[in-house]
From Swiss-Prot:
It comes from Aquifex aeolicus (strain VF5). The keyword Cell inner membrane does not apply. This is Single-stranded DNA-binding protein. The keyword Iron-sulfur does not apply. HAMAP family: SSB. GO terms for biological process: DNA recombination; DNA repair; DNA replication. The gene is ssb. Keywords: DNA damage, DNA recombination, DNA repair, DNA replication, DNA-binding. InterPro entries: NA-bd_OB-fold, Primosome_PriB/ssb, ssDNA-bd. CDD domains: SSB_OBF (cd04496). Gene3D superfamilies: Nucleic acid-binding proteins. Residues 128-139 have a biased composition (Basic and acidic residues).
Length: 147
């Protein structure tokens, strides 16, 4: 099964870092994505969508220190559904678990941190690289047809 997400959006706030009991960093932030389209009358409309993103590990901790509100980033990850129950009601939420986050651009006036001074490759190059993983030959483990 394939579960892969690529989304470009702006951080709506600064990333929040917490730590698991094991000491593993957990970083959470929300991305805003604006969709622009023409309605039935031919007029342009815009609708905003917000996606919660969660990331784990040292790399995620690094992202939290490098990115802040307003930064435009590309998130590569997978969808995860969280389920819980509160006062007898069942709830569910889908969020993005980030595997990679790349800076596209920062808001005007944002200061560069020392480690960010490296040249950021053009977004076209980054998009072209996305999803290109080493291809593995298909092997059918079972000889029987499942129907």
């Amino acid at each position: 099964m394939l579960n892969k997400v690529f989304i470009i959006g702006r951080l709506t706030g600064d990333p929040v870092i917490t730590y698991l009991p094991s000491g593993t960093p957990v970083v959470e932030f929300t991305l805003a994505y604006n969709r622009r389209y023409k309605n039935q009358n031919g007029e342009f409309q815009e609708e905003s969508h917000f996606f919660d993103v969660k990331a784990y590990g040292k790399m995620a901790e690094d992202w939290a220190t490098r990115f802040s509100k307003g930064y435009l980033v590309l998130v590569e990850g997978r969808l995860s559904q969280e389920k819980w129950e509160k006062e007898g009601k069942k709830f569910s939420k889908v969020r993005i678990i980030a595997e990679n986050v790349r800076l596209i651009n920062r808001p005007k006036g944002a200061e560069l941190q020392a480690e960010e001074e490296e040249e950021v490759p053009p977004i076209e190059e980054e998009i072209e690289k996305l999803g290109k993983e080493e291809e593995k030959p298909f092997t059918d483990e079972e000889d029987e047809i499942p129907f």
